[in-house]
């Protein structure tokens, strides 16, 4: 069976508006091959009208879905009967998750954005959450942690390959970018923060920061016939091996011991870009 989570947009006529009004609804469809064609054999009712899907995850006979408009409805789905998928539980919390990662049978680790329920830009941050789904009808956000300022972002929020969970040690590494307006120094890049943030994940103790491996001083140089430009790229990927973690940007890579991320052991800078 193929399971697909979709946001459906319908355009409806609206008095005084020549373009009409767009209405959204969300659903999970189960598809199977019948008579040589792929057909929908089961489908949930429309969910969270007026919102759109930000993330989904299917694990065995269970499914998880996150939609968003102002708060984050987190849905649990029973997919044991492909022809009759059902919503079992729902949890509403501020913000939204953009990637869902199973930790074990009863816990999910997510990354996304915290959004102030009152609206506005201030108060936003990267959000890590640990969900308890042992009671499938009543999921709980067991732990959460806000990371960074309103300017913060992480490539892991929109590319799951940047989300690096190392289950043997219970460690999570994610790229982190922020803007520190209070930083001293001249020029734009003195306030730019590019790091690999590392967290310890424990289903009983929660989410604990282990520190950051900074890449802010690893610059990429672009050379042109009449001028040269250097800039600090964001962290794109990471690798964890034994007691070491590697941070990778478009400008180079750096390694540190996880026990002391503030003391890099080696930095390799890539060659400047030639025209």
Ranges and model annotations:
Residues 1-275:
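Feature marking well-ordered beta-strand scaffolds used for ligand recognition
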């Amino acid at each position: 069976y193929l399971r697909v989570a979709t946001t459906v947009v319908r355009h409806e006529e609206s008095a005084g508006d020549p373009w009409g009004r767009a209405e959204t609804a969300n659903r999970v469809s189960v598809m199977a091959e019948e008579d040589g064609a792929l057909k929908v054999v089961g489908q949930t009712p429309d969910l969270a009208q007026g919102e759109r899907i930000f993330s989904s995850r299917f694990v065995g006979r269970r499914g998880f879905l996150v939609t968003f408009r102002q708060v984050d409805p987190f849905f649990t789905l029973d997919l044991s009967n492909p022809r009759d998928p059902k919503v079992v539980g729902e949890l509403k919390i501020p913000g939204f998750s953009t990637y869902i990662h199973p930790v074990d049978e009863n816990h999910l680790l997510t990354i996304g954005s915290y959004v102030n329920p009152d609206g506005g830009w201030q108060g936003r941050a990267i959000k890590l959450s640990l969900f308890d789904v042992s009671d499938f009808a009543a999921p709980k956000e067991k732990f959460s942690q806000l990371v960074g300022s309103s300017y913060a972002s992480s490539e892991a929020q929109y590319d799951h390959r940047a989300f690096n969970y190392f289950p043997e040690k219970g460690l999570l590494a994610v790229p982190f970018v922020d803007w520190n307006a209070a930083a001293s120094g001249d020029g734009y890049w003195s306030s730019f923060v590019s790091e690999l943030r590392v967290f310890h994940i424990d289903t009983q103790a929660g989410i604990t920061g282990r520190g950051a491996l900074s890449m802010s001083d690893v610059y990429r140089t672009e050379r042109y016939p009449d001028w040269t430009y250097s800039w600090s790229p964001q962290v794109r990927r990471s690798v964890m091996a034994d007691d070491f973690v590697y941070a990778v940007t478009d400008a180079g890579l750096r390694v540190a011991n996880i026990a002391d991320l503030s003391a890099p052991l080696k930095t390799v800078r890539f060659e400047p870009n030639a025209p």
